[in-house]
Amino acid sequence: MSTGVPSGSSAATGSNRRLQQTQNQVDEVVDIMRVNVDKVLERDQKLSELDDRADALQAGASQFETSAAKLKRKYWWKNCKMWAIGISVLVIIVIIIIVWCVS
């Protein structure tokens, strides 16, 4: 029963086919891993940019807080001055009325 093809050749062809399938699977996994690595690097870059933006925002918030505190203090003193002026004017008017009524 000779078919013209040695029996060892059939085994080698099957082995080559399995080897090729395995190589294709390895290539597919390598491609997937390359895509994953690219995504990780891209994500790292975006996180780094986000961290920089967060730092800048924090610095801006600190500066705003300082400016707001200074402004609050400034207008508190202005308010105190206005109250002092108003009370002084009222006292002067009362003194004038008392002096005018007594004379």
From Swiss-Prot:
One term of GO molecular function: SNAP receptor activity
Record topology, Vesicular segments: 103
InterPro entries, per the entry: Synaptobrevin-like, Synaptobrevin/VAMP, V_SNARE_CC
Post-translational events: Ubiquitinated by RNF167 at Lys-70, Lys-72 and Lys-81, regulating the recycling endosome pathway. (Microbial infection) Targeted and hydrolyzed by C.botulinum neurotoxin type D (BoNT/D, botD) which hydrolyzes the 46-Lys-|-Leu-47 bond and probably inhibits neurotransmitter release.
Cytoplasmic compartment segments: 1-81
Membrane topology qualifier: Single-pass type IV membrane protein
Compartments where located: Early endosome membrane; Recycling endosome membrane; Synapse, Synaptosome
UniProt tissue specificity: Ubiquitous.
v-SNARE coiled-coil homology domain mapped to chain residues: 18-78
GO cellular component: apical plasma membrane; cell surface; clathrin-coated vesicle; clathrin-coated vesicle membrane; cytoplasmic vesicle; cytosol; early endosome; early endosome membrane
BP GO terms, sorted: calcium-ion regulated exocytosis; cellular response to type II interferon; establishment of localization in cell; Golgi to plasma membrane protein transport; negative regulation of secretion by cell; positive regulation of receptor recycling; protein-containing complex assembly; retrograde transport, endosome to Golgi
Domain of life: Eukaryota
Cross-link Glycyl lysine isopeptide (Lys-Gly) (interchain with G-Cter in ubiquitin): where in chain: 70, 72, 81
Region annotation Disordered: where it falls in the sequence: 1-25
Record key words, sorted: Coiled coil, Endosome, Isopeptide bond, Membrane, Protein transport, Synapse, Synaptosome, Transmembrane, Transmembrane helix, Transport, Ubl conjugation
Swiss-Prot/TrEMBL site ((Microbial infection) Cleavage) positions: 44-47, 63-64
Regions that span the bilayer: 82-102
Family membership noted in the UniProt record: Belongs to the synaptobrevin family.
PANTHER family, per the entry: SYNAPTOBREVIN FAMILY MEMBER (PTHR45701)
Entry function: SNARE involved in vesicular transport from the late endosomes to the trans-Golgi network.
Assembly and binders: Interacts with POPDC1 (via the C-terminus cytoplasmic tail). Interacts with BCAP31; involved in VAMP3 export from the endoplasmic reticulum. Interacts with BAIAP3; this interaction is increased in the presence of calcium. Interacts with PICALM.
Name listed for the protein in its UniProt record: Vesicle-associated membrane protein 3
Organism expressing this protein natively: Rattus norvegicus (Rat)
Lineage: Eukaryota, Metazoa, Chordata, Craniata, Vertebrata
